[in-house]
Amino acid sequence: SGSCEVKTCWMQTPHFKEVGDRLLVKYQNAKRVVARNSIGGGLGLANVPKKKRKRAPPPPEDQLVFLEDSPNFCNPDGEIGIFGTKDRYCNRTSDGADRCDTMCCGRGYNIKLERRTEWCYCQF
């Protein structure tokens, strides 16, 4: 009487929130790099004084990097088609991108209360 044991291993993606949390940490720790126009190309770390510049080691494979700062979406910039957030409607109770604390970029916001009377065609 022989017995057989089977072991199966697999990889599974984490929950979506965990992926988002990890990406946020990487985004917050991203490093600016400059593209080199030399033989072999490559990327080097930015903001290094010219006198101290040496060939910087390449960023780690799992390091999030960027070439230029993101535009400021709070203020209008017609050159790149950003309208800004001034005079836009926001949602005080939202947890999303339309939340007033986020959308208004710390400038504060006005609360507008409206009272409407509408016909509801109700039947009693």
Curated annotation (Swiss-Prot):
<keyword id="KW-1015">Disulfide bond</keyword>
<feature type="disulfide bond">
    <location>
        <begin position="90"/>
        <end position="105"/>
    </location>
</feature>
<dbReference type="InterPro" id="IPR005817">
    <property type="entry name" value="Wnt"/>
</dbReference>
<keyword id="KW-0964">Secreted</keyword>
<feature type="region of interest" description="Disordered">
    <location>
        <begin position="40"/>
        <end position="61"/>
    </location>
</feature>
<comment type="function">
    <text>Ligand for members of the frizzled family of seven transmembrane receptors. Functions in the canonical Wnt signaling pathway that results in activation of transcription factors of the TCF/LEF family. Required for normal embryonic development.</text>
</comment>
<protein>
    <recommendedName>
        <fullName>Protein Wnt-3</fullName>
    </recommendedName>
</protein>
<dbReference type="Pfam" id="PF00110">
    <property type="entry name" value="wnt"/>
</dbReference>
<dbReference type="InterPro" id="IPR043158">
    <property type="entry name" value="Wnt_C"/>
</dbReference>
<comment type="similarity">
    <text>Belongs to the Wnt family.</text>
</comment>
<dbReference type="GO" id="GO:0005109">
    <property type="term" value="F:frizzled binding"/>
</dbReference>
<feature type="lipid moiety-binding region" description="O-palmitoleoyl serine; by PORCN">
    <location>
        <position position="1"/>
    </location>
</feature>
<feature type="glycosylation site" description="N-linked (GlcNAc...) asparagine">
    <location>
        <position position="91"/>
    </location>
</feature>
<dbReference type="GO" id="GO:0005125">
    <property type="term" value="F:cytokine activity"/>
</dbReference>
<keyword id="KW-0879">Wnt signaling pathway</keyword>
<keyword id="KW-0449">Lipoprotein</keyword>
<dbReference type="GO" id="GO:0045165">
    <property type="term" value="P:cell fate commitment"/>
</dbReference>
<dbReference type="GO" id="GO:0060070">
    <property type="term" value="P:canonical Wnt signaling pathway"/>
</dbReference>
<keyword id="KW-0325">Glycoprotein</keyword>
<dbReference type="GO" id="GO:0005615">
    <property type="term" value="C:extracellular space"/>
</dbReference>
<dbReference type="GO" id="GO:0030182">
    <property type="term" value="P:neuron differentiation"/>
</dbReference>
<keyword id="KW-0272">Extracellular matrix</keyword>
<keyword id="KW-0217">Developmental protein</keyword>
